[in-house]
Amino acid sequence: MARSFSLLMVVLVLSYKSICSLGCDLPQTHSLRNRRALILLAQMGRISPFSCLKDRHEFRFPEEEFDGHQFQKTQAISVLHEMIQQTFNLFSTEDSSAAWEQSLLEKFSTELYQQLNDLEACVIQEVGVEETPLMNEDFILAVRKYFQRITLYLMEKKYSPCAWEVVRAEIMRSFSFSTNLKKGLRRKD
């Protein structure tokens, strides 16, 4: 689980690193939205993660798809957009609404939605600049399959509170790690 999670983080960091150097202009609030989403996700925890250790799961992020790959700008934007879109979809379900405190869930969803809008503006600006559609589709498909495994896990566990806690922790680690590394990358520039 740690190795696949590390690879997920590398993908997110590479995506954010590429996005920081894009010709498109993400609003300065984009990083702030990412941090706020992380804080909200942390606040959403209702039960102790220690009580859910038996429910831990290996979601198998597709290492072979991303290992050692240099992302083009458009690919980085698309992968990051897909990751946020899938997270938004996951937390926008009726089952998710039942699992979390409603006001925190709404705020979290709003932050994700605003990040998606920021990234969509970049996608529109970058389309045609460096398009590699087939390779891009492979990355997006890999992300979708990863989130499909998360969804299947939740269904198998009947959307139990512990299953949602495991998923929340998985998503939270990815947000946290990408935020910390983005800060480090900015210091190097």
Swiss-Prot record:
SMART domains documented for this protein: IFabd
PANTHER family, sorted: INTERFERON ALPHA-7, TYPE I INTERFERON
Organism, scientific name: Homo sapiens
Disulfide cross-links: C24-C122, C52-C162
Pfam families, sorted: Interferon
Any coiled-coil regions, as ranges: none
InterPro entries reported in the protein's UniProt record: 4_helix_cytokine-like_core, Interferon_alpha/beta/delta
Annotated protein name in UniProt: Interferon alpha-7
SUPFAM superfamilies per UniProt: 4-helical cytokines
Protein function: Produced by macrophages, IFN-alpha have antiviral activities. Interferon stimulates the production of two enzymes: a protein kinase and an oligoadenylate synthetase.
Keywords tagged on the record: Antiviral defense, Cytokine, Disulfide bond, Secreted, Signal
Compartmental location: Secreted
TM region(s), chain numbering: none
Family, similarity comment: Belongs to the alpha/beta interferon family.
GO CC terms: extracellular region; extracellular space
GO molecular function: cytokine activity; type I interferon receptor binding
Endpoints of the signal sequence: 1-23
Entry keyword Disulfide bond: yes
Entry's Gene Ontology BP terms: adaptive immune response; B cell activation involved in immune response; cell-cell signaling; cellular response to virus; defense response to virus; humoral immune response; natural killer cell activation involved in immune response; response to exogenous dsRNA
Highest taxon listed in the record's lineage: Eukaryota
